[in-house]
Amino acid sequence: MSNIQVLASSQLSDKIIARPTTKFHPSIWGDRFLHYNISEQDLVCKQEKVEELIQVVKKEILSSNHDQLKLIDNLQRLGLSYHFESEIEKLLEQLSITHHQNHHDLHDASLWFRLLRQHGFNVSSSIFEKFKDEEGNFKESLITDVPGLLSLYEASHLSYVGESILDEALAFTTTHLKAIVANSKDHPLSHQISIVLHRPLRKTIERLHARFYISIYEKDASHNKLLLELAKLDFNLLQCFHKKELSEITRWWKEHEFAKKFPFARDRMVELYFWILGVYYEPKYSRARKLLTKVIALTSITDDIYDAYGTIDELQLLTKAIQRWDINCMDKLKQEYLKTYYKVMLDSYEEFEKELKKEELYKLEYAKEEMKRIIGGYFEEARWLNEGYFPSFDEHLRVSYVSSGNVLLIATSFVGMHDVVTHETLDWLSKDPKIVSASTLLSRFMDDIGSRKFEQKRNHIPSTVDCYMKQYGVSEEEAIKELNKRVDTHWKEINEDFIRPAVVPFPILVRVLNFTKIVDLLYKEGDDQYTNVGKVLKESIAALLIDSIPL
């Protein structure tokens, strides 16, 4: 939490209060995204052209029976599938009853398996038994089938817990794909292999993959010119929408003077919008996206108040005030920065209420309760630091499961999603379903491993890594290895909750999956790309919010 012992503010109410010395770097973007000017006429023209091409694709391509697997894969990879959801669903239902024995080609069998599993069809991994030899190993002849290896590698990331054949497939393909990159740098698929070895499709943010794949698809001699044109136009159109949204949210941030009022907090508005863009990018979720971005911005400030600035007495008063959620509690907060924060928090949720229909308010109330929960978790961690308490691994998880913020963000992501979210959805969420639990634990472990170096530079509560080391008497390396094994297991558990019939609508499950993908991007490099904005995050933001695709 701080580089010095937290002091009781009641003893220092009329004196200078000793504050933590944690310093976060300022925004690297300045006012770059504050203004975005595009005429409505230009937007309408772009939309009309995209819509025109969509209708042509439906008529000329989707009605064809030619290579439906490849078509669905390309629509998804090019970022176009959201335009053709019903058509893709119909095709997948037809493909699901296609006998897999017809797929003797490794690439096609793997693609069939992956596409169906992605959409919740519980197809059996026994389809890959035919590619093994008499000794139970994958056939050596497959090593030269590079497209097949690549397709099997991607399919292996849709595995469930205990599916040994897919674990074997992952090990087999990883070994040989790495060898291709190392020994055949001129191989036409070498660059693509390097990318997916680092982050497979299952763990990749959809829009980032679309940006990458459009350039790959364009170089493919067999590409469909109509699909390529639509993909480019659609990507650039969505980028216009997103830049317009980011401009609105950046103005909200500026008008509230958050950076000035809370100079100790991370100023990461652009990074936060990118984060939420990874959760849902589709135009129909604009309202949900803007609301969630504002909530995550408020949560980031809250985290820094509890983790890098507030004294234990201040935090105790603030926690009580938040639990009551009553503007009259503001008078009990002694410090001006806390009064300002408290009013902004309550005012923001009042504004959110105005944006929702009366029959939608129960969703916001649920999300508000999650905000109270996370703040309770923040205070528990502050108390640990103040008392020098070292929790057990299990005790740490009980609190840090909440303070990770994952459940809060998932709940809040549902608020603006219109009719797809119902009372039943929130009832499902309240029972801590496997996909949410797996995503949250995965996020907790990756966060703690990724932010470890930075946190060690200041006085901070023990992480799950520290607690695991102490509880089980192992080294840091061994603890990290074990937590990474758990991360792999949690990915498999996420896959399992997509199996049809799902308890909640598919878009709900996708939100949870997408939150997990963002965490993978932010923390996989072994650092915290959000706190200390690094190369990966900067390049990702530029790819989606700065650089358009040449037509």
Curated annotation (Swiss-Prot):
Mg(2+) 3 binds at residues 447, 451, 455. SUPFAM superfamilies: Terpenoid cyclases/Protein prenyltransferases, Terpenoid synthases. It holds the Pfam family Terpene_synth_C. The keyword Metal-binding applies. It catalyses: (2E,6E)-farnesyl diphosphate + H2O = (2E,6E)-hedycaryol + diphosphate. Binds 3 Mg(2+) or Mn(2+) ions per subunit. Belongs to the terpene synthase family. Tpsb subfamily. This is Hedycaryol synthase TPS20CT.
